[in-house]
């Protein structure tokens, strides 16, 4: 997998994205002058797939990042899907399609109805943390820190890779990265089945 371009990633340098990821507690260090695509290619070539996932979580714009978390989360939901998890991922997808304040807050409500041990919960939390206020409505605004959404997206995707069949985590990460690359270039990021 070689990345030539990332149309939707607007940061001119990988270092800029690494600063945001570092604020979220991740240890990503890009070489000076590396573009986001160059840095991702370096991570993938070094088989640093977890770090590549983390980098993408902070590199993608908010809606695209949450959509990616939803795609990876859906891939790990198995029948019968517990209703709170279904509700959480659907709330996050609704926010992606129509990013209103009402949908953003509904996503967090659905995330809180889970045990926060699933990728779906973190995808929904990412939608809430994408912007706006963290405070309850009608209280003074408490802006979400810029790194919070990326942390939730990274958590959703990394958890999706190991939640079931952890021995296949690297193969899942490769699929998830292919999805992120597609999203970053204007695609829908739908995951190919594991066998394809």
What are these regions (language model features)?
Residues 122-130:
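Alpha-helical transmembrane segments of helical membrane proteins, especially in multi-pass transport
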């Amino acid at each position: 997998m070689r990345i030539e371009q990332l149309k939707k990633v607007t940061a001119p340098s990988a270092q800029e994205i690494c600063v945001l990821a570092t604020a979220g507690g991740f240890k990503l260090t890009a070489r000076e002058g590396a573009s986001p695509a160059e840095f991702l290619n370096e991570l993938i070539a070094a088989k640093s797939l977890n770090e590549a996932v983390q980098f993408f979580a902070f590199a993608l714009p908010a809606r695209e990042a949450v959509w990616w978390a939803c795609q990876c989360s859906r891939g790990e939901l198995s029948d019968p899907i517990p209703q709170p998890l279904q509700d959480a991922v659907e709330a996050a997808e609704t926010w992606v399609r129509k990013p209103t304040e009402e949908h953003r807050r509904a996503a967090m409500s659905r995330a809180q109805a889970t045990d926060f041990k699933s990728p779906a919960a973190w995808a929904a939390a990412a939608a809430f943390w994408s912007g706006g206020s963290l405070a309850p409505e009608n209280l003074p605004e408490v802006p979400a820190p810029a790194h919070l959404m990326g942390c939730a997206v990274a958590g959703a995707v990394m958890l999706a890779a190991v939640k079931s069949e952890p021995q296949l985590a690297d193969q899942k990460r490769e699929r998830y990265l292919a999805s992120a690359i597609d999203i970053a270039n204007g695609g829908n990021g739908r995951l190919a089945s594991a066998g394809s």
